[in-house]
């Protein structure tokens, strides 16, 4: 790792809050030639009401946009987890005038940009966007700066995701035991309690005991719901 990257990593690791970490990324984005930066973190659960946190220096007029959900405080909530417009680990270069998804931001000076979404082992998705109002991103420039932006997106998600873990992943999830994860794995495979008992060589009574415990830890209503939530937060497969 270069000395410059090592220094940047130290600054990120020294961040005491997600907002502090975002400010470090914002500064680097400016150095790369972008006026605007936004980072969006979407929690994996609740499944139908996923919480979203956004840090941004986008114009205030864009704050109401369901696409950007730009809230500098980081406390904005948007239940549309697909609004980021990109899939995990796939970069997107956009021109707002040409792309309906971003068109409403062009009048606010946000026209050309780049975005990447990263999904972590807990199922949380972080989307980093860099944008500017003038000068299209040409291939020559992209070849030069995209490796750095991809690295920034992963580092931003690693840092901000960790700082926001208590907000995105309920603490009880970390206490799910290996046996409970194995039971949920076989539940997800459609096995009955009796079949799981035979597979794990445990009594039906013990299986039911562990199911009751893990359903409570995951805040689920039944074992099927627990298996779905466990899959989304990366607890299974084991």
From Swiss-Prot:
Which GO terms of type biological process are on file? regulation of DNA-templated transcription
Question: Where would I find the HTH luxR-type domain in this sequence?
Answer: 169-234
Keywords assigned:
DNA-binding, Transcription, Transcription regulation
For molecular function, the Gene Ontology terms on record are: DNA binding
Q: What Pfam families does the entry give?
A: Autoind_bind (PF03472), GerE (PF00196)
**Superkingdom of the source species:** Bacteria
Instruction: Provide the function of this protein.
Output: Represses thailandamide production.
- Protein family membership: Belongs to the autoinducer-regulated transcriptional regulatory protein family.
Other noteworthy facts: Thailandamide is a polyketide that is toxic to human cell lines but also has antibacterial activity on E.coli, S.typhimurium and S.aureus. It probably acts on acetyl-CoA carboxylase in the fatty acid synthesis pathway, which is rarely found to be an antibiotic target. These data suggest it might be a good starting point for engineering of novel antibiotics.
Q: Which named protein is this?
A: Transcriptional repressor ThaA
Q: What is the lineage of its organism?
A: Bacteria, Pseudomonadati, Pseudomonadota, Betaproteobacteria, Burkholderiales
């Amino acid at each position: 790792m270069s000395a410059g990257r090592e220094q940047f990593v130290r600054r990120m690791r020294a961040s005491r809050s997600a907002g502090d970490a975002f400010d470090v990324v914002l500064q680097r984005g400016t150095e790369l030639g972008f006026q605007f930066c936004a980072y969006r973190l979407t929690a994996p659960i609740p499944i139908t009401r996923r919480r979203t946190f956004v840090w941004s220096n986008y114009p205030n007029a864009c704050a109401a946009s369901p696409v950007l959900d730009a809230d500098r405080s980081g406390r904005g909530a948007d239940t549309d987890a697909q609004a980021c417009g990109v899939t995990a680990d796939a970069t997107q270069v956009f021109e707002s005038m040409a792309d309906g998804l971003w068109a409403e931001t062009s009048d606010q000076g946000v026209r050309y940009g780049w975005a990447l979404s990263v999904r972590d082992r807990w199922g949380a998705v972080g989307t980093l966007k860099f944008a500017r109002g003038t000068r299209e991103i040409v291939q020559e420039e992209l070849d030069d700066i995209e490796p750095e932006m991809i690295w920034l997106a992963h580092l931003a998600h690693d840092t901000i995701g960790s700082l926001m873990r208590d907000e995105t992943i309920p603490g009880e999830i970390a206490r799910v035991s290996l046996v409970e994860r194995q039971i949920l794995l076989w539940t997800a495979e459609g096995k009955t309690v009796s079949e799981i008992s035979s597979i794990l060589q445990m009594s039906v009574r013990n299986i039911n005991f562990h199911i009751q415990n893990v359903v409570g830890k995951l805040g689920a209503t039944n074992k099927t719901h627990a298996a779905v939530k466990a899959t989304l937060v990366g607890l299974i497969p084991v």
